[in-house]
Amino acid sequence: QINTKWVLNKKINLPVKLTTEQKGQLCDTLKTSLALLSRETDPVTFADEQAVQLFNMGRGFSIALVYLKKDRRLSLESYIGYMAFKNGIPVSYGGGWILGTSCKIGVNIYPAFRKGESAWMFCQVLRLYHQNFKVSYFYVNPYQFGKGNPEGLKSGAFWFYYRLGFRPVQPDINVLSKTEWKKINTDKKYRTPVNILKKFTAGPVSLHLNKNNTPAFFAPEISTLISNYINKHFNSNRKAAIQNGYYNLTTQFQLTAKNETLSLLYLLADKNNSLSLKEKKDLANVFMLQYNNSEAAFIKNLQKCSGFWKLLNTQGQK
């Protein structure tokens, strides 16, 4: 049994110093490894090669973090890909979609390595995202443990996450999982029926590392807030809303660079007077970093951007 929180809090090493040539070679390795599996992920396909990082996690295990090129980045979340190696051999890949201190995490362990150290390896991925990006809330979509994924159901993947401390977000499913877990611990021969495992896929599972820092919003919810505002105030004309936001930004801060997400967020702030001038300026500065700086810097600054979170809370209460 792995003590997840103990593992996640064990201090990580600084990234390995890589030359420009070594970074290029590492990115080639990532692409080749996925190609051999007939797989592809956006961070690997559209990698910012000079931003790639490699971390030694101990016991011959290392993880490469790969970032998207500036023109491929998402509007709100930061999609950070990874590939893990055991003694230099690729054993796992996936990615994390980070927004604030929350992260939707996905993992794919190569078939030959799915037994034995699978849980420990995934914990190392969580450890890296927790410490390198200050993530305190991880969640896993139901597909990872069986929704539309027969292999996930057959393998009982739900219990893989459960043993690491993840719990169903939906209260009724959480109660059901506790009942099943008790049966498993009482009778070692007991196996959860497939129809119960299917019920578990009604919603995501999550891991809280800081109970006092539960995320209030996720990217789809923010998109819905913005869409509802556009529908109400601009008769569903997104282009007009964006242009209005640009005008306000240009008028108040003389910003000429284009960022549609910032334009729409600023529009919400400006129309509702929910932010002070300083908070608006901080919001603008953070989102201008999104395409003009490293994605790691954007993640860090967005976490500290009180105006962004205040704006969402104000809109969410309406």
Where in this protein do the model-derived segments appear?
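Extended amphipathic alpha-helical segments with heptad-repeat/coiled-coil character used for oligomerization
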Residues: V175-N185, K198
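Long amphipathic alpha-helical coiled-coil/heptad-repeat bundle
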Residues: Q1-L8
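A conserved beta-strand-loop-helix scaffold within acyl/acetyltransferase catalytic domains
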Residues: K11-R114, C123, R127-F133, L267-N272, ...
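Short low-complexity, flexible loop/linker segments enriched in glycine and/or proline
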Residues: L153-S155, K183-D187
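Acyl-donor binding region in acyl/amide transferases
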Residues: I98-I173, K178
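Long, compositionally biased intrinsically disordered regions
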Residues: T186-K318
